[in-house]
Amino acid sequence: MTAVIFIVLSKDTTQYTAVNYRVIEYKIPLYLKLFNFYGRHLNYSFVVNRITQNSKNDIEKVLDISKWMQNNIRKIPKGVDVVDSHPLTIIDRRLGTEDQFSDLLSVLLVYAGVDAFMWFHEDNYKEGVTIFKVNGKWSVIDPYYGIVFLNNDNRHASITELKNLDLNNGLFMHSLNYERIKSDNIRLIFGNKFNDKDGVIKYYTSMFDNLPTKNKINNSSVFELGGRSYTQSPLSRLKFIIYNYLEF
């Protein structure tokens, strides 16, 4: 029996790493793949527990983890390779793209007990936001720029509100410290991506128009949602494997 286990664990498996969005395949033994997987799981748990040790509720978890990312992970400078093997790669390199910020935040939020997933901009798969659920309501955060969206009651706007309200009048962009985004600090936050507030509003309006509805999200399996947030722990990965087997 021991010999059989040894043979199985020594079998080669395929590992994938993306460099500048081109996927590279290489072989590693199964035992090493399992060892690395569990090591990443422990790392996620450790990082999240440290960040959220003083968080009083789920909203504070969302903000505390997002602030930690803003302080510890930089935007990838021009000319530097984009590397992605696992979400932990982003933490190890302390560098991330827009989609990597959103993917990593969703992973860390799920480890913190907050439902979350990454959602891509329909017109550009490299641009994404994180959709999270607090108090039964799905909301949106843009962790790359550190932007949250509040309604007129100064509460995190729901997806329904984001899809229906006018960003100019009924919805306001705020920093992670709840400071309102004004025209004179657009360049400070977004760099050269936008020339003025109108460009920012147009960008987010286009994105929110295509957000999935609350019902669509609630009626979908977590494994059908975007990103890798629900497949990083051993139990969730097992559920994912079973789900794919049953679907097949």
Placement of each model-derived feature along the sequence:
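Hydrophobic single-pass membrane-insertion segments
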Residues: 8-15
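Secondary-structure boundary elements
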Residues: 16-93
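Loop/turn elements at helix/coil->beta-strand transitions in domains of secreted/extracellular proteins
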Residues: 57-63, 110-116, 135-138
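A structural signal for well-ordered alpha-helical scaffolds and beta->alpha junctions
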Residues: 62, 102, 182-183
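His-Asp-centered catalytic microenvironments across diverse enzyme cores
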Residues: 133, 137-140, 144-248
